[in-house]
Amino acid sequence: EAEGTYVKEEYEMEEAVITGIASDTSEVKVTIRQVPDAPNVAARVFGALAAANVNLDMIIQNVSEAGFTDISFTTPGADLPRAKETMERIVPEIGAREFIVDEDIAKVSLVGTGMKSSPGVAARAFSTLGENQINILAISTSPIRLSVVVDGAQAAAAVRCLHKAFDLDSDSVFEETQLSAEEIAAKMNKGR
């Protein structure tokens, strides 16, 4: 055989839309009820949380009704004592009615770089969860991640049904991980 360079045809592999699913049960959700819908209120709330060194993940604000709104956020469970202390002080200061804490939640994230160029991922995920009687409590998106908050007792069922809906093999599922979606995506892309 002759020495030299062999030229072969290169085939691009199709990029998977969803490459992994992560479930994180370590977060809690805090909701501030009947917050006056006025300028600077959110800044005061989240400024106070930042000053107390409370890490935030998802933030949700409802549509204003009769001049009031609800604001919810998720935070690591380890930050809950500081979050509660901050809420006990800031809720009366801003004129909100109350705050409530839900410690039995799970964040389920679908991760994949193909999401940014594939319409319909959210619709498929939401339909799958709905068909399995899993209620979505909050939603967050980025170009490579779709996260939903569900009842903690439904976390495993959510992961299973989404796993099936997106045809993922079992090696792609990271249940109850402490990794962020970006860390999971990096880990999965490293194996390619």
What are the functions of these language-model segments?
Residues 1-192:
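C-terminal catalytic "cap/lid" subdomain
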